[in-house]
């Protein structure tokens, strides 16, 4: 099995970008260990604090954010970072070429029940000569990403990574601390009979999504004339990994549950990197009205609707939104 650096070198990745990705993964190896220790590590449960999103922070949210923040800023490879757990961007090396946005522990509410969690990250180039303290350097559409990925902490620790040359899976060899290539060029099947959505919010969805899901639930007695299965892990990283592995549709649509916050997922460090991974594997990633990676951001923690996965099924879903 091949190690990560030679694979990226063959793709023509700049050495500094490879070094940056390896820096991110160094933090993720430590996170994998802490998550794997569970109750033994003393970091399960919640803190008394909330993050900028108004969400109660888990102890592991704080720990994983600090690990990634420290190792990235100390590396010298980043001009600035943006994190789900930071109110504002954090300046790094003024001479660095790259900026990184990340969700340090997606699905952190799952830690207390020993279920799937993961780290999501997005890498872009900073505008030349930009001030590292200027948050506007992150206001770039997802098509500007030079790398995107996640590390899934499950029975094994898996890295899904793209640098624009396809989506690959690497598995952490915990004996040697090395990520090894275990699937070259993931390909999402165009058709599927699986979908992932938080069905408890159905009464709050827009009519288009309600109609689409109702037709899936109707199965072979409805207009789709075949049966579908629903899956829901309650961690985007887990649900998207299933889509990349065997196909499916994942969505967190716009809803009216909280009128001041109609969308759930963050554009910069959740929707954009997942969209790049999915598109590089032959899938589609949309808000329901536009391609996710075409969106011009207007805030660090901007939220968007997400519909992504198998090409033909996503296109069918989008047809309900026209």
Swiss-Prot record:
GO terms for biological process: fructose 1,6-bisphosphate metabolic process; fructose 6-phosphate metabolic process; fructose metabolic process; gluconeogenesis; sucrose biosynthetic process. It is an enzyme of class 3 (hydrolase). Mg(2+) 2 binds at residues 103, 106, 270. Its EC number is 3.1.3.11. Pathway: Carbohydrate biosynthesis; gluconeogenesis. It is found in: Cytoplasm. One of its GO terms (cellular component) is cytosol. Its main location: cytoplasm. It comes from the Bacteria. Its cofactor is Mg(2+). Mg(2+) 1 binds at residues 84, 103, 105. It holds the Pfam family FBPase. GO terms for molecular function: fructose 1,6-bisphosphate 1-phosphatase activity; magnesium ion binding. It catalyses: beta-D-fructose 1,6-bisphosphate + H2O = beta-D-fructose 6-phosphate + phosphate. InterPro entries: FBPase_C_dom, FBPase_class-1, FBPase_N, FBPtase. Keywords: Carbohydrate metabolism, Cytoplasm, Hydrolase, Magnesium, Metal-binding. Binds 2 magnesium ions per subunit. Belongs to the FBPase class 1 family. PANTHER family: FRUCTOSE-1,6-BISPHOSPHATASE-RELATED, SEDOHEPTULOSE-1,7-BISPHOSPHATASE, CHLOROPLASTIC. Homotetramer. This is Fructose-1,6-bisphosphatase class 1 1. It comes from Pseudoalteromonas translucida (strain TAC 125).
């Amino acid at each position: 099995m091949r190690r990560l650096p030679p694979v990226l070198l063959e793709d023509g990745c700049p050495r500094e970008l490879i070094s940056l990705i390896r820096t991110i993964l160094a933090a993720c190896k430590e996170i994998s260990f802490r998550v794997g220790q569970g109750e033994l590590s003393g970091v399960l449960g919640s803190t008394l604090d909330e993050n900028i999103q108004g969400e109660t922070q888990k102890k592991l949210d704080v720990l994983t954010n600090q690990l990634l923040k420290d190792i990235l800023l100390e590396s010298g490879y980043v001009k600035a970072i943006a994190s789900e757990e930071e109110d504002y961007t954090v300046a790094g090396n003024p001479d660095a070429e790259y900026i990184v946005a990340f969700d340090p522990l997606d699905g952190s509410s799952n830690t207390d029940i020993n279920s799937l969690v993961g780290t999501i990250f997005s890498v872009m180039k900073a505008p030349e000569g930009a001030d590292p303290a200027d948050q506007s350097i992150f206001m770039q559409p997802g098509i500007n990403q030079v790398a995107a990925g996640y590390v899934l902490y499950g029975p094994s620790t898996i890295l899904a990574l793209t640098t624009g040359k396809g989506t690959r899976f690497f598995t952490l060899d915990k004996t040697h601390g090395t990520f090894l290539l275990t699937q070259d060029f993931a390909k999402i099947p165009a058709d599927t009979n699986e979908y992932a959505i938080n069905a408890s919010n159905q009464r709050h969805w827009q009519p288009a999504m309600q109609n689409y899901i109702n037709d899936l639930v109707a199965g072979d007695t409805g207009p789709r004339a075949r049966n579908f299965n629903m899956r829901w892990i309650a961690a985007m990283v887990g649900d998207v990994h299933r889509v990349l592995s065997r196909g499916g549709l994942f969505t967190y649509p716009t809803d009216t549950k909280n009128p001041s916050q109609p969308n759930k997922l963050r554009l910069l460090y959740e929707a954009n990197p997942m969209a790049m991974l999915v598109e590089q594997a032959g899938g589609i990633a949309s808000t329901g009205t536009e391609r996710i990676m075409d969106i011009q951001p207007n805030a660090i923690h901007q939220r968007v609707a997400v519909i992504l996965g198998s090409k033909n099924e996503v296109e069918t879903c989008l047809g309900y939104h026209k």
